[in-house]
Amino acid sequence: MPDLLIELFSEEIPARMQARAREDLKKLVTDGLVEAGLTYASAGAFSTPRRLVLSVEGLSAESPTLREERKGPKADAPAAAIEGFLRSTGLTRDQLETREDKKGAVLFAVVEKPGRPAPEIVAEVLERTIRTFPWPKSMRWGTGSLRWVRPLQSILCLLSDEAGAEVVPMTLDGLTAGNSTEGHRFMAPARFAVSGFEDYRAKLARAFVMLDASEREQAIWHEATTQAFAQGLEVVPDAALLSEVAGLVEWPVVLMGAIGEDFLGLPPEVLQTSMREHQKFFSVTNPATGRIEKFVTVANRETADHGETILKGNGKVLSARLSDARFFWENDLRTVKTAGLEGMAEGLKQVTFHNRLGSQAARIARIEALAREIAPLVGASPDLAAEAARVAKADLQSAMVGEFPELQGTMGSYYARAAGLPEAVAQACKAHYQPLGPSDAVPTDPVSVAVALADKIDTLAGFWRIGEKPTGSKDPFALRRAALGVIRLLLTNNSRAGLMGIMLPAMNRHLEPFDTSDFTPYERDLLAFFHDRLKVHLREQGIRHDVIDACLAMPGNDDLTLLVKRAEALSAFLKTDDGTNLLQGFKRANNILTQAEAKDGVEYSFGADPKFAETDAERALFAALETAEAAIGPALQAEDFAAAMSAMAALRAPIDAFFETVQVNADNAVLRRNRLNMLHSIRATCARVADLTRIEG
C-alpha cells in the first residue's frame, strides 16, 4: 500500500495560522480520500513558515469496485417508462435483468462502478482542498483565480511504495505537481528531489529545515534555558510566545542579549510585555536580583559571526522600544504625583463604557458604592474597598496602558503605590480583574475580593437590565466569564454573601436611567444564570447535574458556598450503598404517595399516629423517623451536611423492612391513611436535606 506525501510551498505563512492550517489540511484531505473510497493507516500534518505538509501512510492503491442494484419499472411497462429508466442507468435493454416479485416481472439494473486509481483520486481531492481551504485571510496574485494565505509557489505530491515513487499528475493555475522542494531560504535554497516522507524529512534537515513545529519549540526552549543556566539566569516561561516563535523560523538559532542598564528600573511586566509584543523576545531574569536583565531572541539562520550582528541590531531596536516605554512610565508617574490616581481617572468621564450604561466614570461610581456594601460580607473595610474601587480603573487613562492594554490593573497597582495608597488598595487595582478564566488565580485579600465582586456584578446587572444576555455561542461582553468569576470568588473565599443580597443593590443602581418597573424578574433570571454557570463549574469537578438540581431546589440557593457544601455531601452519600438503597426506598415511597394523592384528591400530610402501627416493621420505622428528625435538625443548623446524610442513611433498613412486610394500600381505610401519612413523613424528612425527587436512577 503506497504512502502519500503532500507539500504546499508558499511565501511565509503567519505563525498564528499554522496550527489550524495543519488540522484543516489533514481533515480535508483524509476526509476527501475516505469519501472517495480510499482507506489509510495513519496521517500526520506538519508546518514551517513556508510549507504545509501532509504525510499519509498505508493508503489503498485504488478505490473498490461498487455494485449497485436499482429497481426499475415492470417488464411490461410502457416503452417510455423503460426508456427513462435506461437513460438514468446508462444501460441498454439487454443489460437489464428481469426478476419475479409479488407484483410480477420487474426490471432490475445492476450497475458496476469500477474502482479508481489512487493518483486520480488524490489529484481531485488535493485540488478541491487547495481551492476551498478555510484560511482566515487569503489573497490572489498574478492573473490566476487561486486564493491562498500567501502566494503558492510549488506543489509536491508523491505516492511511494517499495517499488518506487510516482508523482501525482495534477496542474493547478499553472502550478504542476512534482517531487522536489526547497530547503532553507538563505542557507540551502537549491531545489532537491525526494522519494518519500522519510527521505523528505531527512533531506530537509540537511537543508536546515526542522519540519516539526513541536521539535522547533523543544529546541528553542532547551537552548534558551541552557544558555540562561550557564549564566545563573532563568528564562521566563511563555508558552504562547514559544509557539509563535516556532512558527516564525525553519532553523531556530537561539541568541541571548543584554538589556541596557538605563531600562532595568522599569517594572518587569513592562519589560516583558514590550519585548514580547514588539520584538518576540523571551525575558531572562536574575534570581538574585529578581530583575529582568537579559533577553532571548531566535534567529532563522546561522551566521559567520555567531549572531553578533543580529544581536547588535536587535539591541538597537529594543533600546528604542524601551525608551518609549520609559517615557510612558515616567510621564505617568509625574501625573500620579501631581494629580493623584483620582486625577488620572478624571478623563474616564469622557470614556463611554456602553452607550446604554453610561461612561466609565459612572460605572466606577456604581462599583464604588457596591464595593462598600459588599465589604462587610467578605471581611473588608468598607472605606478601603470604596477607595480601591474609586481608583482601580484609573490606569485606563495612563500612557502605558494606552500602549499596552494588557497591562491594565498591573500598572494601576504600581501607580497606587507611587501615590502612597494603602497596599490593599494597590493589590485591588490589579486583582479586581481576576479571575479571568477557569484556571486563573482567585484573589483572597478581602479588599480585592470586594472590588472584584462589585466589578463583575455591576457588569452582569447592567447588561442584564438592557437585555444584552449571552445567547448560544455568542457572549460579546464575556458575561459567562464574569459569572464564573463571581462563583469562584465566593467559593474560594468561603464567602457566605448571598447573591440576591448583593445583586439587589446592583439592580437598583441600574434602574435610575430606565423606567421604574419591577426588576424582580431580571434579578431572578440573573440568579438562574448564575445557577447554570455553577452547574457547569461543579460538573467539571465530578458532581452530577441531578445532584446539583436536588440542592438548587432547597431554600437559600443564592448562598453558593452553602449550596456547594450540600451538593458535595449529597454526591458523596449517593456513591455509598446506603445512599443508593435509601434513594430507591425514597422513590418507592414517593411514587406510592404521589399516586394515592392523585387518585384520592387529597394530600396525606397529617402526622402518622404510632398507635395505628400493626407490625414491628411499622413501629421500627416510626422510631427511626423520630430519631432521624432529631438528628437532622441540629446537623442542618450546624451546616454539617455529612451528619445529616448519615442520619438519613439510618432510614435505609427500616424503610426496606417496611416495604417487605407492610401493605400500604390496606383494605382498612384508617390503616391505609396512616401508612400514607407515614410515607409523607419519609418524604418530608428526606426533603429537609435535599430534593431527592430530582435525583435520577
UniProtKB/Swiss-Prot annotation:
SUPFAM superfamilies: HD-domain/PDEase-like. It is found in: Cytoplasm. Its main location: cytoplasm. One of its GO terms (molecular function) is arginine-tRNA ligase activity. Tetramer of two alpha and two beta subunits. This is Glycine--tRNA ligase beta subunit. It holds the Pfam family tRNA_synt_2f. Belongs to the class-II aminoacyl-tRNA synthetase family. Keywords: Aminoacyl-tRNA synthetase, ATP-binding, Cytoplasm, Ligase, Nucleotide-binding, Protein biosynthesis. NCBIfam families: glyS. Its EC number is 6.1.1.14. PROSITE patterns: AA_TRNA_LIGASE_II_GLYAB. The keyword Aminoacyl-tRNA synthetase applies. It is an enzyme of class 6 (ligase). It catalyses: tRNA(Gly) + glycine + ATP = glycyl-tRNA(Gly) + AMP + diphosphate. One of its GO terms (biological process) is arginyl-tRNA aminoacylation. GO terms for cellular component: cytosol.
